[in-house]
């Protein structure tokens, strides 16, 4: 029986899953849209929704909870300064998942997870080694 089995294991250990979702949350908040596999996107959605709700509370305790969940201080600052005011009047449903076909190598179902009222210019901003080398 599968009573109480709510989340997918995604063929990873608990530590690996937690680290992966922390990185994915930070990437989604930074770029406001990421492409990943459909099961990962479905598991990421409630984590990000709870982080946005924490950002809307805007207390010291909620900020510390967000830091412990995400471990990226720059993205926590963006969560509380930019994302939370943007969704102040929305009660849940901050993200959407769009199916994006199948991956070429292993035919895995792919999906785009993005914020509903996302900033178009945020995608690809400050990412990759070329951005860092040009700035230096």
From Swiss-Prot:
Residue ranges the record marks as coiled coil: none
Domain of life of the native organism: Bacteria
Pfam families in the record: Ribosomal_L17
Gene Ontology cellular component list: cytosolic large ribosomal subunit
GO molecular function, one term: structural constituent of ribosome
InterPro entries: Ribosomal_bL17, Ribosomal_bL17_CS, Ribosomal_bL17_sf
UniProt GO BP: translation
Ribonucleoprotein as UniProt keyword: yes
Entry keywords, A to Z: Ribonucleoprotein, Ribosomal protein
Protein family: Belongs to the bacterial ribosomal protein bL17 family.
HAMAP family per record: Ribosomal_bL17
Subunit composition and interactions: Part of the 50S ribosomal subunit. Contacts protein L32.
Protein name per the record: Large ribosomal subunit protein bL17
Gene name as annotated: rplQ
